Structure formats: C-alpha cells, structure tokens
C-alpha cells in the first residue's frame, strides 16, 4: 500500500486532483483515500488523541464540508472522512509513528550506503575506445623498449672499478668520473632515440605542430628514460639497467655525472618494485609525461591537455581493470609522475654542472640537442 508522501505531489495523482473530503488540492494517498494535507492531519490527530467522541455539530450533522467550511464543524468533517473510506486502523500512535519514521530513516541510510558500496566496488573499466588507445600506447612502448622482458638475461654489469670509488677531496657527486661518464654516453643516444620513436608512434603526438613536438620531447626525455631505468631496478644486485643493457650501481650512476639525481632515480626504482607494473602501465605513464601541457613555449596547450586527460582517464580505468591488491594504488601511482617531473627538473640543473666538468667532445650531439636550452 502506498505510504504518505507529504512535501511533494506524487506522480500517480492526476493533475489538479482534489481531496475527496473537502475538495482542496490533494497531495497524495492518505489512509486509503486521496486527500489534502489538512484533512490527512485532521484525521490523524482525531484518531491518535481519540477526539471524535467530543465532536458535536450545531446543525444536526448536516453540514456541507468544503475547503471553506471544513474547520467550522469537526463532527461533520470526521464523519465525511469515514464515509469516503479513510481507515482508522492505519493511523499509528506516537510510539508506532516514531518507530516507522526510524525504520524509514534506517532504510534510507542503508540504500545510501549500498549505493556508495556499489560505486566503490563497480569502478569503471576501459571503454572500447579507451582499449584502442591503450593498445596503441602499449605497442608503441613495447616496440621501443630495449630488450623488452629479457633485459635481465641481456644486461651487462658495468665493471666495478668504473665510477665506483668516490672522488677524493670532492663533495658527494661534485666531480664527474670521466670514465663512467664516457660509458654512459655510449648508450644515451640510442636511449634518447627510443623515446623519440615512442612518441612518434602515437598519432595524437604526430598531429601536433613540429615546434610543440620538440618542446614536449625535450621536456619529457629525461623523465621517460628515468622511468624506463627505474622499472628495471633489481633488488638482488641493487642495480638499475640503463637502455636495457647496462646494469649500474647507485654510486656508479652518481659519480658518472648524475650526482644527486641518481639517488632520486634509484629511490624511485626501489619504490616502483612493489607496484608490479606491467608494460601497459609503464606505457601509459610515459604517455602522461609526454603530453604535459605545462611545458614552457607550447602553442597547442588545450589540445595537449585534452590528450593527457584522455590518457589519464584510460589509465585510471585500466588500473581498475587490473585490480591491484594495494590500497590507494591509483593516487600513489600518480605521485610517481610528480617524482619523475622532479627528476627531470633536477637533471636540467645537473646538466649545466656536467657541461663544466666534462670535455665537450664527450657529449653526443643528440644529448646536447635535447638537453641544451
């Protein structure tokens, strides 16, 4: 049976439907009859307080009850309520009414919690269009990621005597070990080339103006190379593998030119090792870094921002699909984007130091082209 619905006009009422007791505008189905709020309240109070025995009519019970006269004769009004079919047994006493109200509130709260739980459990997964985007980005990464999943078998450890010992009488990371630096420069050109190739496999990147492409690549190159190294951190040997081939220790990377930046990359590697990222997640991180609309000098800011938003949404939905067993996985992973941006900024200032410390002929042309302003 429909319950009382005061406060709004229910959809089951016809437009301008009238109260069967007094003819005023009806508000709903009350105590088995279509009535107005006034007659509903009058009938409820009469029954709850047992007032009807005290009602008396001055005109022999023959009053006409309408919205003007309804308050003039309580007896005739009550008799009409009974005559049209209002049910006394449906009127609750105060204790039952409070219990019913409490039950309604509890049910409402339960529905609210159920809806919230449903939202939490049923996190959206990628749409068909997002799956297409995810596939493009993943294939771009796999095609440009040196050694792929076989990096552990293919890597070669940089000899321990290179770049391992701290430079005498120099602040930590202050001096550059030129032998280690020259080893790193051998792999820097192919590493940069792979980042460029990754970007060029993304249609949305290739559609941007050439000048914007250059700005985006110069901005993200160190960040993406650092990410690719960090996800190849090996806790057993405590090394990172650069460009999928050269395994180096923290000290070697530091003394070979990166200084304190090496600590940030190694710390990121240690942290990411617990995330168990797959190729798609690494690829999407790279795409988010690439499409950073806050790089100075860009002309297509809104377009790039829209691209990044598309990557982020697909990324979040993919994380939902993967169902990582880590609390707050998505926000924690997004923090790594901030860490990588910081690494890129630190490397920019470190590069100036390397220019002072290392002979110009040791710098590969592509290295200078990307990192010089």
From Swiss-Prot:
Binding-site positions, 3,3',5-triiodo-L-thyronine: 194, 243
Keywords for the protein's UniProt record, in alphabetical order: DNA-binding, Metal-binding, Nucleus, Receptor, Transcription, Transcription regulation, Zinc, Zinc-finger
One BP annotation, GO: cell differentiation
DNA-binding region (UniProt annotation): 19-93
Binding site for L-thyroxine: 194, 243, 347
Role, per record: Nuclear hormone receptor that can act as a repressor or activator of transcription. High affinity receptor for thyroid hormones, including triiodothyronine and thyroxine.
Identification of the protein by name: Thyroid hormone receptor beta
Organism (species): Aquarana catesbeiana (American bullfrog)
């Amino acid at each position: 049976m429909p319950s009382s619905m005061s406060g709004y006009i229910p959809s089951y009422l016809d437009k301008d439907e009238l109260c069967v007791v007094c003819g005023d505008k009806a508000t709903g189905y009350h105590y088995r009859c279509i009535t107005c709020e006034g007659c509903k309240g009058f009938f409820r109070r009469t029954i709850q307080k047992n007032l009807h025995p005290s009602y008396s009519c001055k005109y022999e019970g023959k009053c006409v009850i309408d919205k003007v006269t309804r308050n003039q004769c309580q007896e005739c009004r009550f008799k009409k309520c009974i005559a049209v079919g209002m049910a006394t047994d449906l009127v609750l006493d105060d204790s039952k009414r409070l219990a019913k109200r409490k039950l309604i509130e509890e049910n409402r709260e339960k529905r609210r919690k159920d809806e919230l739980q449903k939202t939490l459990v049923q996190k959206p997964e990628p749409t068909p269009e997002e799956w297409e985007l995810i596939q493009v980005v993943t294939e771009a990464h796999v095609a440009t990621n040196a050694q792929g999943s076989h990096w552990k078998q293919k890597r070669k450890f940089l000899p321990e005597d290179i770049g391992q010992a701290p430079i005498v009488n120099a602040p930590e990371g202050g001096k550059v070990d030129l032998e280690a630096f020259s080893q790193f420069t051998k792999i820097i050109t192919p590493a940069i080339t792979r980042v460029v190739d990754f970007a060029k496999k993304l249609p949305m990147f290739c559609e941007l103006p050439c000048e914007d492409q250059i700005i985006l690549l110069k901005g993200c190159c160190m960040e993406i190379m650092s990410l690719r190294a960090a996800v190849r951190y090996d806790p057993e040997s405590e090394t990172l593998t650069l460009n999928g081939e050269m395994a180096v220790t923290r000290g070697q990377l530091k003394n070979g030119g990166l200084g304190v930046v090496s600590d940030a990359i190694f710390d990121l590697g240690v942290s990411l090792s617990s995330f168990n990222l797959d190729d798609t997640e690494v690829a999407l991180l790279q795409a988010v870094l690439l499409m950073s609309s806050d790089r100075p000098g860009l002309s297509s800011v809104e377009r790039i921002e829209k691209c990044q938003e598309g990557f982020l949404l697909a990324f979040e939905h993919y994380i939902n699909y993967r169902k990582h067993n880590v609390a707050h996985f998505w926000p924690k992973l997004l923090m790594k984007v901030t860490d990588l941006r910081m690494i890129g900024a630190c490397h920019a200032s470190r590069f100036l130091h390397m220019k002072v410390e290392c002979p110009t002929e040791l710098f590969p042309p592509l290295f200078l082209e990307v990192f010089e302003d």
